């Protein structure tokens, strides 16, 4: 009979436990909590903070400026991701009202009727200007290339009314003697926005200021019934990008768009007759001249505007470009955490504070935009400080 004892089940368990303990001692990267079990391991100090996503929606007027701000801001704030979607001012207002975006963007300020819709959510909306831009008239006339076209106030209105049919119309030639012999006998195709657009609201408000006929027959708004559509010389494009794409690819077109889009696509822009009778092209200097010429009256950030604010349109001054306007931001006061988590509210406040301070400096401005006057930026900063975390 053999005297050797067989290993018991208990001995095997002891050996396994000893092996596990040895591994814990030999391999320091395995946590003790993992070895002994029980409880979740705590995150190390080296782990990156979670990313906060801020969504902003609406106006395409400030598109290139928004993209510039996002790019510059995220370089020093890698834990914040800002997503921008265009769609136009009307879309931005609706998305904001429905809680589909954190920050709404609209060129014309929100009027009292829509403001009441915002208030019905149980939270306090806030609105204020974020940047200054210009609406320009761009064109595609191959015969004149990149030479500047001058447009007087009455000629501009009559082109968009459809009353001037051909590019070689005597009224256009008279104010453009340098290129008169090059202007072709081709029909003028008017390109306009297909969506509810703040750029359209700015441009049609300006046309209403300079043309009684336009004011009476068409009026101003984010959408209007374009006279040239009724005579087969109107084409619609979605957003500022859609409009400039049509102009760039279609000879004998004329359109309105935000200055930065014309710069980006290397399209010519017209010199428009201003209030003082001078023909002025849009530049930093002429846009600033319009801003300084007009003392804008901006309501409290907690109030809707009683009417579309004309602001700097048709400003006086020899060097003032005539179609200059603010574009606006919409945010919530966030009563009782209604729309933002504490983390998101803090991130929004930090981003918008940066936009209204550092973001207004030349190094953070995209071509075609001008920073806010200091007193206007302060209105926005006061609003940002009202956001509750």
Swiss-Prot record:
GO terms for molecular function: phosphate ion binding. Phosphate binds at residues 59-61, 89, 107, 197-199. Keywords: Cell membrane, Membrane, Phosphate transport, Transmembrane, Transmembrane helix, Transport. The chain crosses the membrane at residues 16-36. It is a single-pass membrane protein. GO terms for cellular component: ATP-binding cassette (ABC) transporter complex. It is found in: Cell membrane. The keyword Cell membrane applies. GO terms for biological process: phosphate ion transmembrane transport. Its main location: membrane. The keyword Transmembrane applies. SUPFAM superfamilies: Periplasmic binding protein-like II (SSF53850). It comes from the Archaea. Belongs to the PstS family. The complex is composed of two ATP-binding proteins (PstB), two transmembrane proteins (PstC and PstA) and a solute-binding protein (PstS). NCBIfam families: 3a0107s03. Part of the ABC transporter complex PstSACB involved in phosphate import. This is Phosphate-binding protein PstS. It comes from Methanocaldococcus jannaschii (strain ATCC 43067 / DSM 2661 / JAL-1 / JCM 10045 / NBRC 100440) (Methanococcus jannaschii). The lineage of its organism: Archaea, Methanobacteriati, Methanobacteriota, Methanomada group, Methanococci. The gene is pstS.
